Swiss-Prot record:
Pfam families named in the record: Auxin_inducible (PF02519)
Subcellular location: Cell membrane
Key word Coiled coil present: no
GO cellular component, one term: plasma membrane
UniProt function note: May promote auxin-stimulated organ elongation, such as hypocotyls, stamen filaments and petals.
Record protein name field: Auxin-responsive protein SAUR65
Length: 148
């Protein structure tokens, strides 16, 4: 039987590990061998080849494959970032959204939305940006989510 102190110590350790895992989004990469396909997930701090990193306003780090640069929704996010923070030569790219909103957008992008949904999402992002600007100085960032 495990004593109480050891059990509490183990629980605290697992909670810390779980908290670290929640902060990272890692993309699955398929590697094909001659007989089977295996999927591995990378959660290290180094960025894999063919990926780029962006940060959110709440300092959460996201790594994306370069193929996301061809997506019109992601292009709009980068334009908004450029308008908000400018182009940084040596610093990281920071998106003017929190991590919850970015995770929401990632789900839409991964689902390969149709043209109408993409247009609605772009309009939602643009309107949220326009409605945020006067309020930013007073109350911080507020965001509206488009629900389908």
């Amino acid at each position: 039987m495990i004593n109480t102190k050891k059990l509490l110590k183990m629980a605290k350790k697992w909670q810390q590990r779980a908290a670290l895992k929640r902060k990272r989004i890692s993309f699955q990469r398929s590697t094909t061998t001659t007989t089977t396909t295996t999927t591995t997930t990378s959660s290290s701090t180094a960025v894999e080849k063919g990926c780029f990193v962006v940060y959110t306003v709440d300092k959460i780090r996201f790594a994306f494959p370069l193929s996301y640069l061809n997506n019109s929704v992601f292009e709009e996010l980068l334009k908004i970032s450029e308008e908000e923070f400018g182009l940084r030569a040596g610093g990281p790219i920071t998106l003017p959204f929190d991590s919850v909103f970015l995770e929401y957008l990632i789900k839409f992008i991964e689902r390969r939305m149709d043209g109408d949904t993409e247009k609605a999402l772009l309009m939602s992002i643009s309107s949220a940006r326009c409605s945020m600007q006067p309020q930013e100085q007073q109350s911080g960032y507020t965001q509206q989510l488009l629900v389908f």
